[in-house]
């Protein structure tokens, strides 16, 4: 509810502008325009303050699980799937069950009609299935972000590739016990021209973590982001700097749509590069980019919950195809 001062302020502004409308005054000066913008800004700030106060009042009344889910949904871009128009031509739609599942995930509720057991034998909970490797869903989630990012980089950068193989370590001294010195090591994406000139190469490695996992759910999300960024840096950064003579950027995202600090910086940079290519405003391009990332993650979450885990990885049982064709006399 508005307090008395806010009500009086709004009423005075309405009366002020109504007088100009009644008089059909089309020659108002810059002063009126400035007052109009100021009034709009003031009312908007009052609404934001009121909403913030309501959130601060209601949040402590929620369960711990729901508090965490709500805080995750408040991260920048994590709720863009809910505020964008559901246009199928742009890929921003969910069918009705997926929409209900998305709302359940948003508020920490258990989606309806879930099985009691996972195909791996564990209890079927949201926390478990978002991390369960059976069926390959964590890899699908990771690859979706990798491929989307690589496709967008291809719009504005050169020499873009996925899963680039790193140069071998041949006697170089890499500090840190966790540094990856394995031959044939690969990262997710490499591109030229991201942070510098067209010959400056940058390597990226994507990590999408489950914020509801037992190892994460009792830790502040920002701390979890930093932890995963540091793991990636300790494994690859010095090798990239010293041997590849390039730069390294870890792209850490939560499965619920949030971004770590360096991922946020990178996607802002990518949006600014796409602006000049697509001739769009920076704010709308960044909003679109966040929405694409969020929808990709959201669909992968729903697939992990509703998808089948029973057949993935099972070999196709058949004889050699040439023998089958020969013995059965198959002809087109």
Residue ranges of each PLM-predicted region?
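Intrinsic disorder
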Residues: 126, 136-143, 198, 223-230, ...
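Acidic catalytic cores of enzymes that act on phosphate-bearing nucleotides/polynucleotides
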Residues: 1-109
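Active-site metal-binding core of divalent-cation-utilizing nuclease and nuclease-like domains
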Residues: 93-125, 148, 152-216, 225-231, ...
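E2/UBC-UEV (E2-variant) core
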Residues: 208-257, 264-290
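Domain-level recognition of nuclease-like catalytic cores that cleave nucleotide substrates
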Residues: 253-332
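Generic recognition of well-structured, leucine-rich alpha-helical segments
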Residues: 24, 152, 156, 160, ...
């Amino acid at each position: 509810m508005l307090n008395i001062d806010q009500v009086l302020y709004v009423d005075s502004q309405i009366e002020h502008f109504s007088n100009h409308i009644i008089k059909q005054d089309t020659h108002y000066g810059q002063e009126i325009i400035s007052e109009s913008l100021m009034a709009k800004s003031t009312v908007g700030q009052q609404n934001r303050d009121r909403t913030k106060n309501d959130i601060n009042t209601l949040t402590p009344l929620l369960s711990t699980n729901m508090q965490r889910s709500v805080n995750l949904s408040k991260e920048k871009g994590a709720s863009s799937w809910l505020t964008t128009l559901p246009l199928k031509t742009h890929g921003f739609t969910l069918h009705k069950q997926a929409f209900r599942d998305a709302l359940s995930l948003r508020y920490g509720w258990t989606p309806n009609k879930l099985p009691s057991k996972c195909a791996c034998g564990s209890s079927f909970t949201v926390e478990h299935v978002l991390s369960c490797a059976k069926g390959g869903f964590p890899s699908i989630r990771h690859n979706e972000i990798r491929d989307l990012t690589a496709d967008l980089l291809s719009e504005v950068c050169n020499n873009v590739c996925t899963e680039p193989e790193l140069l071998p370590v041949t006697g170089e001294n890499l500090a840190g016990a966790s540094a990856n010195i394995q031959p044939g090591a690969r990262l997710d994406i490499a591109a030229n021209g991201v942070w510098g000139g067209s010959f400056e190469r940058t390597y990226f490695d994507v990590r999408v973590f489950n914020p509801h996992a037992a190892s994460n759910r009792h830790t502040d999300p920002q701390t979890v982001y930093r932890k995963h960024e540091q793991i990636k840096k300790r494994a690859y950064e010095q090798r990239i700097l010293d041997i590849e003579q390039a730069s390294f950027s870890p792209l850490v995202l939560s499965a619920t749509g949030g971004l770590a600090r360096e991922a946020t910086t990178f996607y802002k940079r990518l949006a600014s590069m796409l602006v000049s290519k697509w001739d769009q405003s920076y704010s709308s391009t960044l909003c679109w980019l966040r929405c694409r990332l969020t929808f990709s993650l959201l669909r992968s979450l729903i697939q992990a919950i509703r998808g089948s885990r029973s057949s993935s990885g099972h070999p196709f049982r058949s004889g050699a195809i040439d023998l089958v064709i020969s013995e059965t006399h198959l002809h087109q």
